[in-house]
A protein has these predicted regions:
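Residue-level "contact hotspot" at macromolecular interaction interfaces
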Residues: 101-103
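Catalytic domains of carbohydrate-active enzymes that cleave complex glycans
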Residues: 1-90, 96, 105-112, 116-145
Length: 146
């Protein structure tokens, strides 16, 4: 038993390698990227918050419904937006103003991109862009069906 205490003292007594200082810092990251919604148990995750080397991007959020029933979640928008779901590869709403009412089926996850309303869409290989900014890196949907 003393052997374990000696090992513990070896690792945690010096401030230059005190791992205890760093063991909980990941909780701060989770708090920074997570936001409550108006439905208990459904969280909105900011997919761009910790991407420090990101290319230009539109607001992107992941939302998952863990409930056994369909749920309606209200989402606030910063500007008029077309809502693109990169999981389904489709726009699920067009020309939304300040709030969008999202209906999620049970166990459904969406990754939503708030694209400026009426943005010009282009395909560049598998990339789908809106006004030159990538909104889907692996789009299989033909441009004329969006």
């Amino acid at each position: 038993m003393n052997e374990g205490l000696a090992e513990k003292e070896k690792w945690f007594s010096r401030s230059d390698n005190n791992l205890a200082l760093y063991m909980g810092n990941h909780v701060g990251f989770l708090g920074a990227i997570c936001e409550l919604t108006d439905v208990p148990g459904i969280l909105k995750w900011d997919c761009l918050k910790t991407d420090w080397h990101a290319q230009p991007a539109y607001p992107t959020s992941m939302i998952y419904n863990p409930h056994a029933t369909n749920q309606a979640v209200s989402l606030s928008l910063n500007a008029p937006s077309d809502i693109y779901d990169s999981v389904s590869g489709q726009f699920i709403a067009k020309a939304q103003q300040t709030t969008y009412q999202l209906t999620l089926e049970s166990d459904q996850v969406v990754v939503l991109v708030a694209v400026p309303a009426g943005a010009g869409l282009q395909k560049q290989g598998s990339h789908l862009t809106a006004n030159g900014i990538v909104i889907d890196f692996n789009s299989n949907t033909p441009l004329d069906t969006l």
